[in-house]
Each structure stands twice: as structure tokens, then as C-alpha cells.
Amino acid sequence: METLLSALATLYANTDREQKLQANNYLEEFQKSPAAWQICFSILNQDDSSIEAKLFAAQTLRQKIVYDFHQLPKETHIEFRNSLLQLFLAAKDSPRPLLVSLAVCMAAIALHMTEWHNVIADVFQACSSKDPSGRCVLQFLSVLPEEASDPRKTSLSWEELCIRVDELLRDNGPAVLELLVQYVDAVRASGSPSSADLGLVLTSLISWLREIPLDKVMASPLIELAFRSLDDDLLLEDAVEFLCALFNETKDVDETTDAILMLYPRLLELQPKLIAACDDPETFRALGRLFAEAGEAWVVLIARMPNDFLPLVNCIAQVAANDTELEAIKFTFAFWWDLKQMVELDVYAEARQLFAPIYLELVRIIVRHLHYPRTEDLAINEQMASNEVLFEDRDAEDRFRSFRHEMGDVLKDCCVVAGVSSCLVQISSQLIKVLKIKESGLPYYWQDVEAPLFALRAIGRMVPANEDQVIGSLFQILPQLPENNKVRYAATLFLGRYTEWTAQHSEFLELQLNYISAGFEVANKEVQSAAAQALKHFCYDCREQLVGHLSQLHMFYLNAKTYLAPDPLMEVAQGLAHIVDIQPVANVYQSVHSFLAPSLQSILLAQVKLNPTQAELEALADNIDIVTIFLSLVHPPSPAGELHPIVRLFQDIWPILSRTLDTFSDVLICERISKLLKNFIYTFKEKAIVTLPVITEALIKGFEKTQYGCFLWVSGACVRQFGVPEMDEQTLSAVWSFVGKQCTNMFYYMSNKNPKEIPDVIDDFFRLMMDALLANPQMVLESQMLESLIQAAMMSLQLEQQEPLQTVLNFLQDLLAFALHTPPYSLIEPLPDSLLKSLADLLLKNSQELYIILFNGMVFTFPRDNISDASAVLIPLIRLVFAADPSLCIKYMSNVLDQLPAMTIGQEEREKFLANFSKHCTSSEMPRLRAHLQDWTAMYRRRVLTPRAKLISDD
């Protein structure tokens, strides 16, 4: 015990992190040991034990009950329970964290000691005599439902858990309600009850709410207690939590109308309190949440009975309007969306008409909340527009920006209910008003311009292209906008959102393009990025109008390339590529070549530089991306049988790209060229077949030289496109010879590397193999390398990264599906039975090793997200083995269980697991078998791998 206490002291002392980690590791191992049971009891029984030691002991006991209950002989369960109950009662006056921890221990023993049948009555009886205050029984009741209903907090099977939950919770709900009512009556009779006691009653009632019939809850005096508690600052949060939980139980309005009609008048009585709380942010936030969650729960009834529930909708609008701290309004967002979803249905047209004015007023409210912070000093306020961050730090700025987009979504809801035109007028009138003030020379704040512009951008997709009342007049006031970065950024993105409208109203095109183009000259990254994004949308949606101006756009591009940052330049290139794409096909080659010429020249210059810097490599990669954009997005139809002009261009520039691969072994450059090749293949498909020989040669050479996975994922594109049975024999032979060479290189690479060192390459390789299986399974299954592939897959199962491991498991799953005559996808022609039998024999040959690897991975090494993938391999493997030899299947499972550490699994548990396993295998209940395996392995992992308590922070 001294070592234990010393480790705890180290954790709480001002020692270095290494010592804390060592102490933490010791304590975690202690928590898993059989000796922990007795030592924890000793600590809790000693009056002189520190509160930290007692808390640790209580937490450890709870973990022992959850994970290691099998370590206690069944004949000791009653004695253990009684001892724990005595400890719990003795702690009635202890600090709350210790009392809560011991209550959780009692809840855990109540769940796992399945032979204990009168839990609530026994605990209540014990507490009545030893703890007249009721703290213990209330604390126990408040934690029991959560502990009992979470499958992650138990070692019981799902069936056992369901039975136990019914016995502990559902059969006791009314009795618990009666007990809570009796407790409240008793404490009131004895004098003035404390807020802490009543808060615990409300917390307990929240925990049990789902287990008690709603009519019994509504008939109890606890409803009155909850509403009265809203006047007590110490009980406000507990009361709101309970009432919100109660509202949530009334969502099925057809079944709970009576309860709603009882609660609704009481809620409306709180409106004066809501208004009075405008200067009390905490109370306003709590009450705002109460009204909003009531609206969410009753939204169906609100749509059906709009006149009756209009006062509630007005109250929720008041929450949005009066929330100066922007803390309560977020609770209303879901309600506005839910109500919109209801009233846009024709059957609720009356409700839509009634609520439209509220939604229109909500537009005004939202625009007001969209404003950036400002200062009354106009000169300083204007300078703020040049600041990158307007809040105390970047995180606060990012949170506000994210919050603005949420409010923008509410504006879209307003458009549906109040009408797009009305919302446009509401927003634009605010913008026009401030611009008139500006034009008259009076002082104004740029925030009053920026917020409506953001709002107009937010509702852009709601505005139809034939709108002819508002948008055109808004575009005409562009010259009146104040010139600062924040306003220009907002206005530019606003223009970019209305490009589909502009395509139908081309008379406004030049005005907007001039405004956007001016943004490129502003020395601000955000403004330039917005201009590039807007121009991209214009080039796509207005390409028919712009194709005649391609020469001017080409000059603009050449100029922009000299000063734009890479990201906005890419967006500009994407936009221009869309215009080039709709030219006559005869002009495409020359046009694309002219846009690519600067990038190709830069690539050539980079090839002769010695020892390029990282910045120079990144610039080279960016130029390769420009080439990728044009080769991917420009693909106009071309006459059948003719070489596509972009394919011809690819052939002409291939020597430059090939020499770049030969010159640079940097992963960044190889990946960018690989991306180019993959996009080119998928864009031009069979038209690109003439380039296949040079591409596959480069991929073989590149992978052999660098072992970069990027060459494998392009190989997969080649196989999927050109390795399918429909291809001619010569192409098929070339493709599968190419696949064989890539496999040979990979096997050699894996023979010299630990798989854990190359997870990404393994991921890319097995993605290639899955592409090969999908393209032509017969070629893969006939391959002489199939056994080597299976061996490589098994070797790769020692990986610990989720994505590559999932890829390997998916590959094995596909192989097993073929072996079981259940191919993972439809085939044009069935595969020969002899081929499938050979595959099955090969898998059976490796079945024991694969069985062990998969099971051990599921219980020890695989990431949690891979467990379902692993079971999707193990289950068909079990089917395959069981069909060949049932006794062998049981033997495999028995052997892997025998290899588990003895103290981690009891004999009774082992026998029960094997019995269920055998039963499910024999009856071919594969879904039940899968659930059985996944539930048990999840429980075992929690027992063995999960840290028993997070005792130190990660920072």
C-alpha cells in the first residue's frame, strides 16, 4: 500500500511529467490487479486516508466491478455488496465527489450482481436507517440509470444487460417517483429544504424520467417543484435540465397532448421573467433554452394549432432578439429549421402565413447579430477593417465566423417561410439605408454595410435566377460601397454567390467583373482569395458569355500568375479552364497550350536547378497542379476515331513531365505528377489508351526507384480503366504484366521493411489489389502470386493505423467472399468453380494463422474503428473453416482463448463464450455470431486495454 500511496502523492505533487507518467502507469496496472479489491477497501475504511486516496480507491472499485467482476468468486458477492453498502452509507457526510464515486460503485454492483433482485428496496431500507438526510439514496438513484443503460460500462452480454435493465429500471420507475415525492414532503415538513437537496431530487428525476409513465410524472407535485425552482438561482440549471428533459418526452404529440396542454400555460407564465432577465445573461440563457426546447418538442402541434401556439413562437423570437451575449440564440436555431420544415408543407399553409411576419422580423434580428464588433471612434473603427482579427484572439474570431454561418442557415429558413422577395427587401433596405447615410456625408459604420452583404450572400442559393425586383438594383450600388478590406471581401463573395442569376442577366456582368478584378489588386490575402473564388464561379456559370473574351482573360491570367498566391491562382485556373472547355474543339489544343506555357516554362527551368529549396519545390508542385487542372477540366467531345486534342497535348508535354520524375525524387513532386496522371486517365478513359505504355513504364520505374505509394494508386487507375475483360488481348496482357511487376517490387520492398514502417504504401498497394479484383477478378485469382498476396496481407495485419488496416481487411474480405461463392460485386460471367475451390483451399491452408491474427487483433491491437472490419473477415473465415471441418473451427477458438492472460478471463466466462460460439456456428446464425464476437471483444478490450482512469492530463 505504501507504494500505491507514494504513486498517488507523486501525481498530486509538483513533480516533473516523467515522474507523473511513471506513477500513472503504476496506478493503471494496480487497478487491473486482483490485489486492488482488498487494498481499496482498506483505504476507504481508514479515517486518516486522504481524500485523493479515497477517490482513487472508489474509482478503482468501480472499474474492478465493471471489468474484473469475474475475479470475485460468486460466493463472495453478497459479502462484497454489504461491505460496499456500509462504506457508501459511512460516506454520507463526505465531500460530494467521494459520495458520487461510491454511489457509482453501488450502481455498478447493482448491475453486475445479477442474483441481487430487490436492489431499490434494499438500498432504500439501508439508507432509511443509516442516513435520514436521504443524500445517499438520492445520489444512488441519480447515477443508477446512466450506469445501467450504457453497454460500454458493463461486461454483461447484450441479452443479459437488457434483462437486468428491465429489472433495475423499468420495473421500478413508479416506485422511485413515489420515493422522491415522499422525500420532498418529508424535508418540507421538517423545515426549509436546502437547494442542494432539491437539486438532487430533480437530477434523480431526470435520470428516471424515461422509466416512469408520463401521466404519473405530470400528476406528481414534482412538476410544481420544478417550476418554482426557476425562481431560485441555485436551482435554476437543475430545473431547466428537468423541464427540457420533460419536454423531450412529449415529442410524440399525439400521445402526449394532455401533458403539453398542462405544461404550455405554465411555460407562457415565464414570459415576463424572460423579458426581465435581459440584463442577467445566465438566467436569460437558461430560460431561452427552455422556450426553444419546448418549441422543438411541440413543433408538430405548433404547425397544427398555429393560433394557439403563436405566443410561444413570439417568445422564442424574443429570445433571439434580446440575446446581447449571443449565448441563447443558438438554442433557437433547430426550432426555426424544424418549424420551417413543417410549415412549408401545403397542409400547413395557414401556419406558414401566420408565422411569416415572425420569420421576416427574424431576418432583421439575424442581420443585427451578424455585425462585427465596432468602436464608437469612427477613425479607429475604420482602421479595424484592415485588421485580420477583430476579436481578442484567432479562436474567438473563428468561433464568431462559424456562428455567422449558422445564422446564415436560419436566414435560408426565413426565405422559405417569409418568401425570398420579402427577405431580400428586408436585407437590402438595411444596406441601402446605410449607403444613403454614407453618400450624404454623415458618419456611418462599415459593419452596417458588411453584415447585410454577408446576409445576401447567405441566402444566395435561395434566390431564383428570374428574380427581377431587388438583385439588379443591388449590383448597381457597387460603386457606392466603402473601400475597405472587410466590405470588399463580403461584397466579392456576395457577387460570387449570384453568378447563376448573372448568367440570365448579362447586362450586369461587366460591372461585377470589374469589381472582382479590382480585388486582385488589393494587398490582402482574404480579398484576393475571395476574388479568385468569385471569378471561378463566374467563369463556370457565365462561360457562354465569357468565351468570346478568352484572349483578354488570357492576358489577365498571365498577369495574375506573377503576383497571386497559389491557392487563388488555382481557383482562377479552374474557372478559366471551364471557359476553354466550351470552345470549338479545333481551338482547344492551342488555347490550353497557351495557358500552360508559363507553367511548362517554369517546370523546365526547375529541372536545371541544383539543390532546389523547399520553396522552389513547392512552386514546381504548384505549376504541375496548373497543368493538372487544364488536363482534367478541358475535355470537349471529339470525333470518334480521332486523337483527342488534349491527349495529343499530353503526348507533347510528356517528355517534360517524365524528365521531372527522373530529376526529382521528392515525394511532393512525385505525388503531384501522380495526381495529374490519375486525373488524366479517369477524364479521358479509353481515349487515353495510346498513352498507356509510357505511363505504366513511368509508374514501374518510379515505384522501383522511390517506393512511394502514389505510383501504386495511379497503377490502380490504369488497372480499373484498361484491365477489364472488355479490353483487347494485347492491352490486357500489357496491363496484367504491369500489375505483376508492381507486385514483385512490393513483395521485395516488404521483405526488407517492417510493415509498421510503411503503412501508407501498404494502404496504396492493397487499394491497387482491390482495383485489380474489381476490374478482373479472374486474372487476380489465377495469378501465381495469389498466395504471396495472402501472406503479405496477413503480415500487414500488424499495422495499427485505421485506414491502411481497413484496406487490408477489405481485401481479405473480398477474397473470402469469392471463396464462399458470394462475390462482393456482380460479375458479367461467373468464375469457374475450380478457380474458387483453389482459392478456398489456399485460404484454408492459411486459416489457423489468419484466425489467430484476426482474433488477437480484435482484442488487443486493432484500432477500435477496425473491429467491425475485422469481424467482417473473421466471420466468413469461420464459415469457410466450419464448412470444411466443424471441430477445427471450435478448436481454433478454444486455442486463442487459452492464449489470453489467465487473470483477464474467468473459466465460467470462457465456457459460456465457447458454448455460445459453438451454438451460433452450428445453427449458421452468422449475424448473431458477429454480434456475439463484437460485443465480447469490445468488452474484453475495455477490460484489458482501456485506461482505468485518466489521472493526468495530456498537456
Curated annotation (Swiss-Prot):
GO terms for molecular function: nuclear import signal receptor activity; small GTPase binding. PROSITE patterns: IMPORTIN_B_NT. SMART domains: IBN_N (SM00913). Residues 23-90 form the Importin N-terminal domain. One of its GO terms (biological process) is RNA import into nucleus. GO terms for cellular component: cytoplasm; cytosol; nuclear envelope; nucleus. PANTHER family: MRNA TRANSPORT REGULATOR MTR10, TRANSPORTIN 3 AND IMPORTIN 13. This is Uncharacterized protein C11G11.07. It comes from Schizosaccharomyces pombe (strain 972 / ATCC 24843).
